[in-house]
């Protein structure tokens, strides 16, 4: 009996150290809309991780005071954006970190580079592999990866294109370089699928996306839909096309009378988690997934809006 108590106490006292940060809040990103979405994602997961154990996070100097009183949160202050990679390496070298998760954009290989750093240390990455980010973070490479498995908009290779009016005169045109690609416009319902990807692929929820001329302005999480199972199946087929997707993955979908179109695969945490309520929490599911444990969960969803 005493031996059993000792084992239980030892198990309870094991501290798990989680490195978690969101790039906009760590870099002091100037775009207020990006910061707002970044904070929504960060705050949601931070509270969940802190319910599990101790968290270390990188925060830009202007935001530190907002989190200074959080129990079990260790803050590493960032003064300039170019400090982030070195601070991350230093933490991974000096701290006994068990798990790491970075929320960052795919732009300019930011998420890819930060993930490569995490992968070079003996910690469990709760997110996607750098290999998967390299593909899913590039819209054309994603198209090439999934086009034979699922419906997706016709997409042309990224190269220089000229766009001009059919009946214009005077040589007026717009020139687009290799940073742009041309893709067929698909009209229909803007939806997304939230999944956890590991040894199995678990769809968490089907979500409605609110999109207007300002961009993504909110959503409704865990909706019912007559095609829900079929949409889940198409999202799973797309995810299977890219090796190394792991943890939380978001798949953007458009549904119309012609079928179910896979638009993008997001190899990272998305703003949708703000309205996603799982039991156990998403943070706990990510850790269980990293440890190859069987996942059992219940899902509820909420509507949310982003004031832009």
From Swiss-Prot:
Pfam entry (one): ATP-grasp_3
EC main group: ligase
Binding site residues for Mg(2+) 1: 252, 264
Listed EC numbers: 6.3.4.24
Note describing how the cofactor binds: Binds 2 magnesium or manganese ions per subunit.
Catalytic activity reported: tyramine + L-glutamate + ATP = gamma-L-glutamyltyramine + ADP + phosphate + H(+)
Binding-site list for Mn(2+) 1: 252, 264
UniProt domain ATP-grasp: residue ranges: 89-291
Record-listed ATP binding positions: 115-192
Binding-site residues, Mn(2+) 2: 264, 266
Residues binding Mg(2+) 2, per UniProt: 264, 266
Listed NCBIfam families: MfnD_Meth (NF040722)
Name of the molecule in the record: Tyramine--L-glutamate ligase
Species of origin: Methanocaldococcus jannaschii (strain ATCC 43067 / DSM 2661 / JAL-1 / JCM 10045 / NBRC 100440)
Classification of source organism: Archaea, Methanobacteriati, Methanobacteriota, Methanomada group, Methanococci
GN (gene name): mfnD
């Amino acid at each position: 009996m005493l031996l059993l108590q000792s084992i239980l106490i030892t198990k309870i006292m094991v501290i798990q150290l989680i490195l978690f940060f969101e790039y906009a809040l760590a870099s002091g990103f100037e775009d207020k809309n990006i910061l707002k979405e970044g904070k929504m994602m960060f705050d949601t997961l931070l509270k969940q991780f802190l319910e599990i154990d101790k968290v270390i996070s990188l925060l830009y100097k202007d935001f530190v005071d907002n989190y200074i009183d959080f129990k079990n949160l260790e803050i590493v202050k960032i003064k300039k954006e170019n400090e982030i990679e070195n601070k991350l390496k230093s933490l991974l070298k000096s701290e006994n970190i068990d798990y790491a998760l970075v929320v960052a954009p795919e732009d300019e290989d930011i998420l890819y580079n930060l993930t490569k750093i995490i992968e070079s240390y003996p910690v469990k990455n709760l997110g996607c592999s750098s290999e998967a980010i390299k593909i899913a973070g590039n819209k054309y490479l994603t198209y090439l990866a999934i086009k034979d498995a699922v419906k997706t908009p016709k997409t042309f290779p990224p190269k220089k294109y000229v766009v001009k009016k059919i009946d214009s005169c005077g040589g007026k045109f717009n020139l687009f370089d290799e940073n742009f690609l041309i893709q067929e416009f698909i009209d229909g319902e803007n939806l997304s699928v939230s999944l956890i990807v590991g040894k199995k692929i678990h769809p968490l929820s089907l979500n409605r996306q609110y999109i207007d001329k300002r961009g993504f302005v909110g959503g409704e999480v865990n909706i019912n839909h007559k095609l829900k199972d079929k949409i889940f199946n198409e999202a799973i087929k797309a995810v299977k096309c890219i090796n190394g997707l792991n943890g939380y993955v978001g798949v953007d979908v458009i549904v119309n009378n012609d079928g179910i179109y896979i638009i993008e695969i997001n190899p990272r945490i998305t703003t949708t988690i703000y309205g996603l309520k799982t039991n156990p929490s998403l943070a706990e599911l990510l850790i269980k997934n990293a440890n190859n444990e069987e996942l059992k969960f219940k899902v509820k969803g909420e509507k949310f809006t982003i004031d832009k």
